[in-house]
Amino acid sequence: AREKKILLSDMDATIIENETLDDLVKLSGVETNVDETSKLAMEGKIDIKTTLDTRLNYLKGKPKSLIDQALARIKFHPGSEVLVKTLNQKGFITSLVTGGFAPISTFVGDRLGFQNVISNEFKFKDDCFTGEYVPITAGKNSKLNYLNKLTDEKNISKSQVVAIGDGANDL
């Protein structure tokens, strides 16, 4: 039972180099220190939901087209595509589980070949950000809850999971 069977990966600053929500705030033209807010959240010094709410508020009323600009700036970490492709070929279940947002997470997941993409979802009205979202992975234990559900459904031991991430909420 030591053989690994699941890859659970974070997205921002892990499988890609970017912090995509920070990129969106910067692209929107709002003057703020989002990098520091993100850093504190990743260190567990600020609640992840609070920091998401704060950063999304900066996007309220901004055009949805900012997403296309953010997608154009995504930098994949070297080897990320090979990692996912190889593990898929070896029969792993590969899941991108991120506090980031669809459609960015969907783009990254599809591009790299993840079988599952679990993320929050932006809400839009009249092609603009509303500042609200569907909080699928916003909770402190959201990623752990997903892992528990997946391992229970597949009857796989947690010792058979490879999890990679950079933040306090990354298992």
PLM feature segments, named:
Residues 1-49, 53:
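Active-site neighborhood of HAD-like aspartate-dependent phosphohydrolases
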Residues 29-30, 61, 122-123:
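Short connector loops/turns at beta-strand edges and beta->alpha or beta->beta junctions
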Residues 69-171:
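C-terminal cap/substrate-recognition subdomain and adjoining C-terminal extension
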Residues 51-81:
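Metal-dependent phosphoesterase signature
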Residues 19, 32, 46, 62, ...:
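Conserved active-site and cofactor/substrate-binding residues in soluble primary-metabolism enzymes
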Residues 8, 12, 21, 56, ...:
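Generic secondary-structure boundary/loop-capping signal
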Residues 2-4, 45-51, 66-72, 134-138:
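Short acidic/polar alpha-helix capping motifs at helix-coil junctions
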Residues 27, 37-40, 54-58, 70-73, ...:
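Residues that form generic nucleotide/phosphate-binding pockets
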